[in-house]
Curated annotation (Swiss-Prot):
First-level EC class: hydrolase
Location(s), subcellular: Cell membrane
Gene Ontology MF annotations: RNA binding; RNA endonuclease activity
Source organism (scientific name): Malacoplasma penetrans (strain HF-2) (Mycoplasma penetrans)
Gene3D superfamilies documented for this protein: Hypothetical protein af1432
Protein name (record): Ribonuclease Y
Length: 469
């Protein structure tokens, strides 16, 4: 009985413990669920408070992001370009240094090449050129004839002066009015002078005076009569002179005979005191001889050279220069185009279109540049000297220039601080080419000398400054 009681108590205790454990488990489960619900309740407001963007906002955000990305790309490109530019600038500076160094070497090579080419050209052509020119000029050597604007006629005695002057100067005055020249009679001079810039008038007056002096009697009627006779025969004289020049000297026969008197008038015209007809004949012969050496038509060369100054036969009678007058005459007499081009191009009014026109320019200068062939006035000489010095001084590094020996030599003073020895070799070539391009050295060669020297001076102390203590 007592044992059963104990057993029941134990069973009851076990049941109590089991029930307590059951309730504890249930309580724990409930508490966990409450805690979970509490967390969900606590977290839920955060989820509900989140801002949900609209479609417009998303679109704007995407556009903004796109703009930022584009800006980033632009910045990246600019940065890349900057780096490239920086590298390019550095490379350019290096390139400039290389170019500068190469330019110096190139200048030296240029000097060597120029010297070599000049030597080859001189070796190959100088001998032939000298031969051709000497040969051409040997075949036609004209006497040097220098004319002026006046004729001087010697008188047999002083008594002739009174007859020439006439009563109250009537004879002299009538002679001047008839011939349109100046009659100069100076005391204590056994001669009279006829002066006029018009060569035809001067020649007619000279012939009239010679006829009057032969009669030894002079009056107004005889002056008019003799002048009329001279004037009537003068055209025939010019015709004969022109015929002699064309047919006998140059063997040109296919020219209109009406051109002969005009050609003859060239005999009375001068250019820088050189007889124009003789100049034209000489140029024609030179052109023909050179043309033969060049294997071109010597007849065409001869014609083009002879007629290049034909305008000087009439230009003193009209208000025109001799080139335009020559072209008008050539067209009037139906000259061929190559002759017309030679006339209008020999003073560079137009460019030469044929080899004959170019040849005319050469022989024109050859004839005009013969020693003594032409007289140059002091004003023209000094003007030429000034122009030569001006051209030399136009180059950088040239401090001064002096023309010496009547224009045959030029001394060019170089600043040594601006021009090196090597650069002098290039400078002297540049000066040479520029002078040759001008019209100042076409008549004779000019020797150019560069003078580059370093000068430094110092003054010594006087004896008073050297007293010893």
């Amino acid at each position: 009985m007592q044992q059963n009681t104990v057993t029941l108590i134990l069973v009851g205790v076990i049941i109590f413990l089991f029930i307590s454990l059951f309730f504890y488990v249930i309580y724990s489960f409930v508490q966990k669920k409450k805690n979970r619900n509490f967390k969900q309740i606590k977290i839920q407001p955060k989820k509900n408070n989140k801002i949900t963007p609209t479609s417009d906002q998303k679109l704007k955000a995407d556009e903004f992001i796109s703009i930022i990305n584009k800006k980033r790309e632009i910045l990246n490109h600019q940065r890349a370009d900057y780096l490239k530019i920086k590298e390019t600038q550095e490379s350019y500076q290096q390139l400039q240094e290389v170019i500068s160094e190469y330019q110096k070497k190139l200048n030296l090579e240029k000097i060597k090449l120029i010297d070599q080419m000049e030597k080859e050209i001189k070796d190959n052509l100088n001998e032939k050129a000298v031969y051709y020119m000497i040969n051409a000029m040997e075949q036609h050597a004209e006497d040097i004839i220098s004319s002026k604007f006046s004729f001087t006629i010697k008188l047999e005695n002083e008594g002739m002066k009174g007859k020439i002057i006439g009563k109250d100067g009537r004879n002299k005055r009538h002679f001047e009015q008839t011939t349109k020249t100046d009659l100069i009679i100076e005391p204590n001079m056994p001669a009279i002078t006829i002066s006029s810039p018009n060569p035809i008038r001067r020649e007619k007056a000279k012939r009239t005076m010679e006829k009057l002096l032969e009669t030894k009697n002079m009056d107004i009627a005889k002056i008019s009569l003799f002048y009329k006779e001279v004037e009537e025969g003068f055209e025939q004289t010019c015709y004969e002179i022109g015929k002699d020049a064309l047919e006998n000297k140059l063997h040109i026969f296919d020219i209109d005979k009406k051109m002969y008197p005009i050609v003859g008038q060239l005999n009375f015209r001068t250019s820088y005191s050189q007889n124009v007809l003789l100049h034209c004949v000489e140029a024609a012969v030179l052109a023909a001889n050179i043309a033969q050496k060049l294997n071109i038509d010597p007849i065409k060369a001869k014609k083009a050279a002879f007629f290049h100054d034909i305008g000087k036969a009439v230009d003193f009678e009209i208000d025109n220069d001799h080139v335009n007058s020559g072209v008008e005459l050539a067209k009037k007499f139906n000259f061929e185009d190559y002759i017309i081009n030679a006339i209008e191009s020999h003073h560079n009014k137009v460019s030469p279109k044929t080899v004959y026109a170019a040849l005319v320019k050469v022989v024109d200068k050859l004839s005009a540049s013969r020693p003594g062939a032409r007289f140059v006035s002091n004003d023209e000489y000094f003007k030429r000297i000034e122009e030569l010095e001006k051209i030399c001084k136009s180059f950088e590094g040239v401090s001064d220039a002096y023309v010496i020996k009547s224009g045959r030599e030029i001394e060019v003073i170089i600043d040594p601080s601006l021009v090196s020895d090597d650069e002098c070799k290039i400078l002297i070539k540049d000066i040479k080419f520029k002078l040759e391009d001008s019209d100042l050295v076409n008549k004779q060669p000019i020797q150019i000398t560069l003078i580059r020297k370093f000068t430094q001076s110092i003054t010594t102390l006087g004896s008073a400054s050297r007293l010893r203590t």
